[in-house]
Every structure is written in C-alpha cells, then in structure tokens.
C-alpha cells in the first residue's frame, strides 16, 4: 500500500535510486496504490550523469510492495521492499533493465515490457 509521501526504491537502471510518491492516479479521492498501479513520483536520489535527475517528476508503476496482495486463488504475495519502475510520457519504461523480482499482477495490467525485462516474475 503506497500513499502520498511514501518513498520507494527504483527497480530499473534509469539512474534514480529513491523516489517519493506525490500522487496516486485513478480518481480524485484515491488514497492507496498497490502492485500494478501508476503513481506520480518525484526523484529524491539519483546517480550522477543519469537519464533522470533529482527533482524530476515522472510517472511510475509499482512492481513490489511490503503490504501483501491477495490473488484470485486465495494466496497472498508480499516483498521485502516497496519498489517502482519509472515510466516515460508514452508509458514505456525509462530504463533498459529491471532489478529484482516483479509481481505477476503486472501481466494483467499490460506491462509486458516490464515482465519481459524482469529476471523473475512471482
């Protein structure tokens, strides 16, 4: 469960290390986001000479959350960290590699590019 002011790790090689959620997309009163949801983020930490700079505002899709997500078969999945992948204006990932596992829920949300780049889909 990600809300405004939550900090997330970045799970791609765009150059950002940490981002903070500044808006949950999908309705004016929407408070929380989970795996597969798109949020607006601000870059809080970035490595030098990277594709993104500190202070940039971008969209991101959540790929891992500490809060468990219930699946249709009744099972739950949760991760050790909150992580997101940065997206361009066109909805494509900014980075060319994805680090760490991602949740299978992204497949239902049509993030096939992220699924194909990920080393493991849980």
Swiss-Prot record:
GO terms of molecular function: large ribosomal subunit rRNA binding; structural constituent of ribosome
GO BP terms, alphabetized: translation
InterPro entries noted in UniProt: Ribosomal_uL14, Ribosomal_uL14_bac-type, Ribosomal_uL14_CS, Ribosomal_uL14_sf
Protein's UniProt keywords contain Ribosomal protein: yes
CDD domains: Ribosomal_uL14
Keywords: Ribonucleoprotein, Ribosomal protein, RNA-binding, rRNA-binding
Keyword Mitochondrion on entry: no
Cellular component annotations (GO), alphabetically ordered: cytosolic large ribosomal subunit
Self-association and partners: Part of the 50S ribosomal subunit. Forms a cluster with proteins L3 and L19. In the 70S ribosome, L14 and L19 interact and together make contacts with the 16S rRNA in bridges B5 and B8.
PANTHER family assigned to the protein according to its UniProt record, in alphabetical order: 50S/60S RIBOSOMAL PROTEIN L14/L23, LARGE RIBOSOMAL SUBUNIT PROTEIN UL14M
Function: Binds to 23S rRNA. Forms part of two intersubunit bridges in the 70S ribosome.
Family in the record: Belongs to the universal ribosomal protein uL14 family.
HAMAP family, per the entry: Ribosomal_uL14
Name assigned to this protein: Large ribosomal subunit protein uL14
């Amino acid at each position: 469960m990600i809300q405004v002011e939550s900090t997330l790790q970045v799970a791609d090689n765009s150059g950002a290390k940490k981002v903070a959620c500044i808006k949950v997309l999908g309705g004016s009163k929407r408070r929380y986001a989970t795996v597969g949801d798109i949020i607006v983020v601000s870059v809080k930490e970035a490595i030098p000479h990277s594709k993104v700079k500190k202070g940039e505002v971008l969209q991101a899709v959540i790929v891992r959350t500490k809060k468990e997500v219930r699946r249709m078969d009744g099972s739950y999945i949760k991760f050790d960290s909150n992580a997101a992948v940065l997206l361009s204006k066109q909805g494509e990932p900014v980075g060319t590699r994805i680090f760490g596992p991602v949740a299978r829920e992204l497949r239902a949300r049509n993030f096939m590019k992220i699924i194909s780049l990920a080393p493991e889909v849980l």
